C-alpha cells in the first residue's frame, strides 16, 4: 500500500509538471508544443559465485519538450524540474528552433490520430523494492545450477531487476494522457566443463508481473542443462543445408524486418524492401499481426512517442507486406499517414503451423538447429545476412552433437521466402512472439 501511494503521488506530481511546462511554453511562444516526462524507479542486483557484485537503485526522471516554430523544430530535455529549470529548457528548445531549417513535413500529428483516452492494458503490477528478496532471487538460480550437475564449475553471474515506469505525455492540441507499467527480469549464465572443453550458456525471462517470471530454481536448472548440452561442441564442414532457428533466435531473425520497413529507411531509399509494399516476401501461409493492446504484453502501449493511438494491424498477410512502419514525419514525407510507430513496434504475433518443436525437427530430418547468434552482420540496404552461430547438428530428427565456430549467410529476402514451417513453442519473453522456424536451406561456413 505504501508503494502504491508513493507511485500515485509521483504520477500526480509528473502530471502537474507536464501541465506547467505546457503552460510556460505557450506563454513564451506561439507555436506547436509537445511535452513528455518519463520516470523510472527500480532496483537491479548482480551476483556471481554467491557474492553480490552490484546493487543499483534507480530513481530517474527526464522531461522532454519539442517545439515546432513555423515548421522549424527544436528539442530539449532536462532532469531539473524546478520552474527555472523548465524555463531554461524551453528557452533552449525555442532557440534551437530559430536556428533549424524550416521543414514543411515537421509538426504535431493531426488531432484525429491522437490518443485522448488511454486504455488500461493491465501493465502495472508493482511489488516492494526489497533488496534482500532481490538478492535471494538472483542467488537461487545460480545455486540451483551448481546443484544440478558437477560439470557446472563456474558462474558468469545471475541478475534480477524490478522496475516501474510512469509516462506522461501532452501537447498543444489538448492531449494529456499517462500510463504506468512494471517490468521484471531474471537472467543466469553458467559455465560447464568436461575433460577437454568448457562451454557457457544462459537462460532468462521477463514479464510485467513477478508471478509470471520464470521461477529462479527452474531458471538455474535450464541454464545448467543448456551449458552441459554444449560440451563437446565441434566445427562442421562448410555446407548448404536446412536450418531451424530456435524460438529465441527466431524472434531475432524476424526483428530484421523492422528496420527494413521503417519509414526513415523508406524515404531515404536505404532498404532492400523499398519496392516490395503489397508484394509477397514470405510464404503464403505466414502472417504477422501487430497487437499493441495485449494485456500484460511486453510491447503493449496505448499510444506511441508522439501521442498517436496504437492500433491492431496486419504487418504481413498471406505472405504479403501490408504496411510500412511510419511516424508523423516520415509518413508526410511519403504522402501517407502515421501508423503509430514513433518509438518502435509493439507486440508482433508471428503465425505458426501448430506443430510441436519435436515435429519440426522430424520435418527437417537432417540439418542445423541454431540456438545462439553472434555479431551484427545484417545489411538492411542490400538484405545480405552473415552472423556467427552455435547450435546442434540434427540427424533423423534428433540431436546428434553440439556445433560451434560457424557462420551462416544468405540474403534476408531469400531466407524469408525459404521458410517451410514454424512450430508452436512460442517465445513469450520477447515482443516478437514466434516459434522455432525451419528454413529449407542456408549457407553454413565451417571447416
Swiss-Prot record:
SUPFAM superfamilies: Putative modulator of DNA gyrase, PmbA/TldD (SSF111283). GO terms for molecular function: metallopeptidase activity. GO terms for biological process: proteolysis. Keywords: Cytoplasm, Hydrolase, Metalloprotease, Protease. One of its GO terms (cellular component) is cytosol. The keyword Protease applies. It comes from the Bacteria. Its EC number is 3.4.-.-. It is found in: Cytoplasm. The keyword Cell cycle does not apply. Its main location: cytoplasm. Pfam families: PmbA_TldD_1st (PF01523), PmbA_TldD_2nd (PF19290), PmbA_TldD_3rd (PF19289). Probable metalloprotease. Belongs to the peptidase U62 family. This is Metalloprotease PmbA homolog. It comes from Buchnera aphidicola subsp. Schizaphis graminum (strain Sg). The lineage of its organism: Bacteria, Pseudomonadati, Pseudomonadota, Gammaproteobacteria, Enterobacterales.
Amino acid at each position: 500500500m505504501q508503494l502504491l501511494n508513493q507511485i500515485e503521488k509521483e504520477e500526480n506530481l509528473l502530471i502537474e509538471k507536464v501541465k506547467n511546462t505546457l503552460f510556460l511554453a505557450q506563454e513564451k511562444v506561439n507555436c506547436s508544443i509537445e511535452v513528455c516526462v518519463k520516470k523510472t524507479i527500480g532496483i537491479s542486483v548482480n551476483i556471481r559465485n554467491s557474492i553480490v557484485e552490484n546493487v543499483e537503485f534507480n530513481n530517474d526522471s527526464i522531461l522532454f519538450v519539442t517545439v515546432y516554430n513555423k515548421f522549424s523544430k527544436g528539442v530539449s530535455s532536462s532532469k531539473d524540474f524546478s520552474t527555472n529549470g523548465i524555463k531554461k529548457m524551453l528557452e533552449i528548445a525555442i532557440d534551437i528552433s530559430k536556428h533549424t531549417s524550416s521543414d514543411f513535413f515537421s509538426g504535431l500529428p493531426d488531432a484525429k490520430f491522437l490518443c485522448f483516452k488511454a486504455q488500461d492494458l493491465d501493465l502495472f503490477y508493482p511489488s516492494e523494492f526489497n533488496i534482500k528478496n532481490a538478492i535471494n532471487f538472483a542467488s537461487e538460480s545460480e545455486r540451483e545450477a551448481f546443484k544440478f550437475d558437477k560439470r557446472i564449475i563456474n558462474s558468469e553471474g545471475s541478475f534480477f531487476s524490478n522496475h516501474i515506469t510512469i509516462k506522461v505525455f501532452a501537447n498543444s492540441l489538448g492531449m494529456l494522457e499517462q500510463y504506468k507499467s512494471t517490468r521484471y527480469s531474471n537472467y543466469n549464465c553458467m559455465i560447464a566443463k568436461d575433460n577437454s572443453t568448457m562451454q557457457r550458456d544462459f537462460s532468462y525471462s521477463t514479464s510485467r508481473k513477478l508471478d509470471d517470471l520464470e521461477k529462479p530454481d527452474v531458471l538455474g536448472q535450464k541454464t545448467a542443462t543448456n551449458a552441459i548440452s554444449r560440451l563437446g561442441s565441434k566445427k562442421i564442414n562448410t555446407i548448404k543445408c536446412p536450418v531451424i532457428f530456435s524460438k529465441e533466435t527466431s524472434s531475432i531473425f524476424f526483428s530484421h524486418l523492422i528496420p527494413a520497413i521503417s519509414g526513415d529507411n523508406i524515404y531515404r531509399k536505404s532498404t532492400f524492401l523499398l519496392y516490395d509494399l503489397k508484394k509477397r516476401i514470405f510464404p503464403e501461409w505466414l502472417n504477422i499481426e501487430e497487437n499493441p493492446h495485449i494485456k500484460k504484453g511486453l510491447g503493449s502501449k496505448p499510444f506511441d512517442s508522439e501521442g498517436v493511438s496504437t492500433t491492431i494491424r496486419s504487418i504481413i498477410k498471406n505472405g504479403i507486406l501490408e504496411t510500412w512502419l511510419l511516424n508523423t514525419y516520415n509518413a508526410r514525407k511519403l504522402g501517407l499517414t502515421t501508423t503509430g510507430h514513433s518509438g518502435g513496434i509493439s507486440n508482433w504475433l508471428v503465425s505458426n503451423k501448430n506443430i510441436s518443436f519435436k515435429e519440426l525437427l522430424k520435418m527437417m530430418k537432417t540439418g542445423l538447429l541454431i540456438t545462439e547468434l553472434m555479431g551484427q552482420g545484417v545489411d538492411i540496404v542490400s538484405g545480405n545476412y552473415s552472423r556467427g552461430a552455435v547450435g546442434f547438428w540434427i540427424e533423423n530428427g534428433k540431436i546428434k552433437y553440439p556445433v560451434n565456430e560457424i557462420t551462416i549467410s544468405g540474403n534476408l529476402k531469400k531466407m524469408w521466402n525459404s521458410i517451410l514451417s514454424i512450430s508452436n513453442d512460442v517465445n513469450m519473453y520477447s515482443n516478437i512472439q514466434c516459434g522455432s522456424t525451419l528454413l529449407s536451406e542456408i549457407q553454413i561456413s565451417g571447416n
